[in-house]
């Protein structure tokens, strides 16, 4: 184990357009090679597209989509006497948010639409309606945890 103290969680500066810390984290996760302005253009473009398509507040739509993608439980490998068990554990709120964002962005990148703005907008709208690849990933994770519920007494 590390001899150093636990690292402190850095504060994220809220994004300038909506004043949302969650959205700022989302932009930072989408960013590739430090190109934040491009990531912001993509996210804001997707949010504008969502607002035009649904005539709802795009930030609320994004938050609902993230809520539908965030996992409640996940499995972690635990080695006991030569056998490796997939032990279901609850996900901490900060990790839950991070996983939800990561899965949403990964699912958007794999979509077939033209341009990342359209891909992200489509994936967020799908996630809001509880469908799409990101929601499927969450369901698979929950199914895995449910299947390995018998090993939950191996928690640490």
Curated annotation (Swiss-Prot):
The keyword Iron-sulfur does not apply. SUPFAM superfamilies: Ribosomal protein S7. GO terms for cellular component: small ribosomal subunit. InterPro entries: Ribosomal_uS7, Ribosomal_uS7_bac/org-type, Ribosomal_uS7_CS, Ribosomal_uS7_dom, Ribosomal_uS7_dom_sf. GO terms for biological process: translation. Pfam families: Ribosomal_S7 (PF00177). The keyword RNA-binding applies. Keywords: Ribonucleoprotein, Ribosomal protein, RNA-binding, rRNA-binding, tRNA-binding. GO terms for molecular function: rRNA binding; structural constituent of ribosome; tRNA binding. PANTHER family: RIBOSOMAL PROTEIN S7. Belongs to the universal ribosomal protein uS7 family. One of the primary rRNA binding proteins, it binds directly to 16S rRNA where it nucleates assembly of the head domain of the 30S subunit. Is located at the subunit interface close to the decoding center, probably blocks exit of the E-site tRNA. HAMAP family: Ribosomal_uS7_B. Part of the 30S ribosomal subunit. Contacts proteins S9 and S11. This is Small ribosomal subunit protein uS7. It comes from Methylococcus capsulatus (strain ATCC 33009 / NCIMB 11132 / Bath). The gene is rpsG.
